[in-house]
Amino acid sequence: HTDKERVWEFVNRFASFNHFVYSPVANYYGELYSLPFNMNTFYQLWGTKTPKEAMKMIERQVKEAGITEPSNLEEQAIRLVGKDIYEKLVKGYTRKQWGMECKELPAFIIQRLPIRFTYDNNYFNHPHQGIPQDGYTAMVGKMLDGIEVQLNTDYLQNREKYDNLAEKILFTGPI
């Protein structure tokens, strides 16, 4: 997915793309919720039908929590989406992703949480989205056509040799 025309034109030199819209669904103990957080999510949780109703519900929960200056991820998430969404859709996912409790993580981690007051389940707001029809392996293979690729090579042991091969070296191994 991209919003950059130049990037889209570049990758289309190597592959044809199937149309694809990423619209994930969260499963909380058998209850299914639309992602990113949007009017479908708010309706599924609270039965709210308008952005105004959803905003009021979030504002009420934020006010009840009394959070004005979030000091950790938990507080920041509650301030952004309210207690219900935090408890059902943020807390467990974040704990699993980071291996830490939300109270132990800094607030800035969740500042980019997508929240939309529309009935749009499209996770990305990009005009170009797709999956290569022949797969990513075929696409990358075409991108690397004519380029020497060395696998299972210890760059760090042979650094001087490889550094002299080109002006720029892209090292993707562990440091």
Regions found by a protein language model. Name each.
Residues 175:
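Aromatic-residue-lined binding/catalytic grooves and analogous aromatic/hydrophobic interfacial grooves
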Residues 1-14:
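Glycine-rich FAD cofactor-binding loop and adjacent beta-loop-alpha segment at the N-terminus
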Residues 22, 26-167, 172:
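Active-site/ligand-binding neighborhood in enzyme catalytic cores
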